């Protein structure tokens, strides 16, 4: 995680390498839900996280906590679905390798609550906090291929913001994943995900928001109903 938190005009730099990420993550959770009918689908992707850290200076101690909520809702359409190779016959079913491509549009809701606590050696403690929320429109693409019955790979990415209303000037997200089918209805996966956005706005003491680049490995499971 790297970026800048701006609260009432006060800017604090954030730079947390992956090996230190668990030390500053106070809580975190991700959830993805998708419903599909033929080529159409709708999906929800949610991230809840609370990050925090502290540093001691010669004249002042600094404590930073950032509560982050990111929810996106998208609707998409499958533009490509093609069989790859010959069918594979199993004892109870026949399976066909496929390559697929989906396109989608949606909206991503950001809510960040940075709290900065300044504790000088001389004088009173000072706490600066704000709440910044906005919705970014976005459009994107997702592709997936079956390498075998067990192994699948997928890529997805989107761009958004575009400076529409209160939206960020530009935001983007990309992810690559490899999955293993445990059964016809259960898949486990691992991958890498990057999310970059800038919600800083205003001038002087009214300048608030967060500019953040989050990236790192992801692991999870998928269940088909």
Model-predicted regions and their roles:
Residues 1, 37-41, 46-52, 79-81, ...:
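Transmembrane beta-strands of outer-membrane beta-barrel pores
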Residues 47-135:
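Outer-membrane pore/translocation modules
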Residues 25-29, 65-71, 99, 131-137, ...:
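Residues that define the transmembrane beta-barrel architecture of outer-membrane proteins
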Residues 1-48, 214-225:
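Short glycine/proline- and aromatic-enriched beta-strand/turn motifs that initiate or cap beta-hairpins
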Residues 2-9, 54-59, 87-88, 113-123, ...:
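Outer-membrane beta-barrel translocator domains and adjoining extracellular loop/strand segments
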Residues 173, 179-225:
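Predominantly the C-terminal beta-signal and adjacent terminal strand-loop region
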Residues 31-37, 73-77, 105-107, 139-145, ...:
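Residues on the lipid-exposed face of transmembrane beta-strands in outer-membrane beta-barrel proteins
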